[in-house]
């Protein structure tokens, strides 16, 4: 056995031992939580332990397929492989909002679009959709993905059907929609400009609205039907766009929505309100309360740069409603990285890029993904002139991709640091020890 192999085996044994010790500890569950005990706070969705960091676990068993699904999954092997990496076992809940679920949705859209070239239909019937979704889940699990994607991403067999959209026939679709206008707007999008100008998104909305009007029965609120028709429009687009750009386009459109919303759940703020009011008379107590509160947020999920800005704005606005007028983000040195899952300590906070990105598999190091470990951007305190954290009118400049810091090692081009599975394995053990 080589020295490297000995090291890997020893490390794996240490990790497993630490995990077992943590389970046998007499420490009460409440002691794992931050100082604040929220009334309705979510339990941190963290797996107990990751697979061996150096030798990633893959379910090598052949998936048991139904044989009743007509979709050609083998024609989308690369897409499915990327999806399995983005939804890798224990990391799927942590990457769900930014990587896993958007990639899974794009994969389903593209596969259904490809199938329409043979069937002339942009949706499956209910029976087939159940078999096909089950088969895809089996294939993904066989490649290392989580077996709980239906819950993590709220994916149901109805997502493969037309749902309430009245048009699924390709010929009928093309005779109803201004396809030239749709293609012109979506043929080649800039992922940054599109989120502000919304040219492609508006074209998709127009097309979805047009085909939704073909329904025989009218609805008081047509928004659900239009959303269902948007899925049909995206499947048609997947057949017309350059194959090398389809995934990037769909992921780019998804990221426009992702970056507009803070995915964190904010528990009550009684401790902060009690310690940070009265013109900040007790700065030490205030910052201790803020640190305790933020430590709870740090156990929820990984988020992007722009989501962190949304979260900072949301939290700051809530604090202002408690009559906290001082910029306690500045006083207590709260940065944007403090709103995301932490890796060991606050200096290693992980903010994902605001542009679409994928996890990468390496046979030696396992699963890695790009984290912004270099940009220490202070969390902005909301001002009266800033009514909202608009994606296009951010109060601070945030790089779409991580910027290189001279004080940190350049492990890859452009100073991008890859956070490998080993680091997160250690994090998970520390959180539970």
UniProtKB/Swiss-Prot annotation:
Keywords: Cell membrane, Glycoprotein, GPI-anchor, Lipoprotein, Membrane, Signal. A lipid is attached at residue 405 (GPI-anchor amidated alanine). Residues 406-433 form a propeptide. It is a lipid-anchor; GPI-anchor. Residues 1-26 form the signal peptide. The keyword Glycoprotein applies. The keyword Transport does not apply. GO terms for cellular component: nucleus; plasma membrane; plasmodesma; side of membrane. It holds the Pfam family SPARK. PANTHER family: GPI-ANCHORED PROTEIN, OS07G0102300 PROTEIN. This is Uncharacterized GPI-anchored protein At1g61900. It comes from Arabidopsis thaliana. The lineage of its organism: Eukaryota, Viridiplantae, Streptophyta, Embryophyta, Tracheophyta.
